[in-house]
């Protein structure tokens, strides 16, 4: 069977490809990775490439992820909604016409962060900015067009050894700077792309599940906590030579174009129950990803 991966050059796409060969899924599916050569905003182009590959499952990891960039101007907003809203709709339309299954990646940014307990899949959405609104548009399109043959996976605070993310940026700044200031009033759960990849493989191979699932590593922390842990683990692994002072600041002291949710914790109970999986502690996952970075260096 054939599986198409969109967004193959993103951090999740790279992780999926890196783990593919050693995973049991590779014995059942042939992977077709697509990045910019597959324009998900152009249905005709998408149809030609996917039909030629005989695809029966799609993992849509393609996304416009510039949270602040999406707020800059009308063109940025248009691009965000084209990639994050129209793109998933096109994939769902093609999947419906061809009998394929679609697994679509989404985000905690569909929520406004005003909750006081972990968000469940059925909780009301209320995105605070363009990025979250565009991702919600994609969710709604997929659910409407392909209600029984789609899975939407919301993940929070995604990071990996690849590309640009909080972990990689923090490690770089800890080498370049004498001190760091990180917000302490935004709370959530990190998600390593490695753990998320295992969950996605589980969804594909089980051939069950539909609707929305939440997935993250286990534990609740602030961005400040995450930065402090990155420094500790980075020093242990030899990626950092010394520690630097890390200041704990409020969101108000670090203004950005886009408003971030203050609380982004996701309830993963449904994912754990339906797919018999247990999410791993975030610190354990962080240690593994840092080890991967050390091995690459």
Regions found by a protein language model. Give the residues of each.
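NAD(P)H-binding glycine-rich loop region in Rossmannoid oxidoreductase-like domains
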Residues: 40-83, 96
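Amphipathic terminal alpha-helices
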Residues: 280-297
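N-terminal Rossmann NAD(P)H-binding glycine-rich loop of SDR-like oxidoreductase domains
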Residues: 1-22
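Active-site loop of classical SDR/Rossmann-like NAD(P)-dependent oxidoreductases
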Residues: 11, 223, 247-268, 281
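Mid/C-terminal beta-alpha module of Rossmann-like enzyme folds, strongest
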Residues: 199, 206-256, 297
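Catalytic helix-loop patch of NAD(P)-dependent Rossmann-fold dehydrogenases
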Residues: 75-90, 110-153, 157-158
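Rossmann-fold cofactor-recognition segment
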Residues: 32-42
């Amino acid at each position: 069977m054939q599986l198409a991966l969109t967004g193959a050059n993103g951090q999740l796409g790279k992780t999926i490809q890196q783990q593919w060969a050693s995973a049991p899924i590779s014995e059942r599916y042939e992977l077709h990775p697509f990045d910019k050569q597959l324009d998900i905003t152009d249905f005709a182009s998408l149809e030609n490439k996917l039909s030629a590959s005989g695809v029966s499952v799609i993992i849509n990891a393609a996304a416009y992820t510039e949270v602040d960039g999406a707020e800059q101007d009308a063109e940025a907003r248009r691009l965000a909604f084209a990639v994050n809203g129209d793109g998933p709709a096109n994939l769902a339309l093609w999947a419906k016409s061809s009998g394929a299954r679609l697994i679509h990646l989404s985000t905690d940014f569909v929520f406004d962060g005003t909750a006081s307990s972990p968000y469940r899949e059925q909780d009301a959405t209320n995105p605070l900015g363009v990025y979250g609104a565009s991702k919600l548009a994609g969710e709604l399109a997929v659910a409407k067009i392909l209600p029984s043959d789609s899975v939407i996976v919301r993940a929070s605070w995604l990071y990996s050894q690849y590309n640009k993310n909080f972990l990689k940026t923090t490690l770089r700044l800890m080498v370049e700077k004498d001190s760091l200031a990180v917000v302490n009033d935004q709370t959530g759960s990190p998600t390593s792309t490695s753990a998320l990849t295992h969950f996605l493989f589980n969804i594909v191979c089980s051939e069950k599940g539909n609707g929305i699932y939440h997935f993250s590593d286990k534990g609740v922390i602030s961005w400040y906590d995450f930065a402090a842990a990155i420094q500790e683990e980075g020093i242990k692994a030899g990626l950092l030579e010394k520690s630097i002072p890390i200041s704990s600041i409020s969101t108000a002291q670090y203004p950005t174009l886009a408003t971030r949710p203050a609380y982004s914790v996701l309830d993963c109970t449904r994912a754990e129950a339906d797919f018999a999986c247990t999410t791993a502690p975030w610190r354990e996952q962080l240690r593994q990803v840092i080890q991967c970075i050390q091995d690459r260096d």
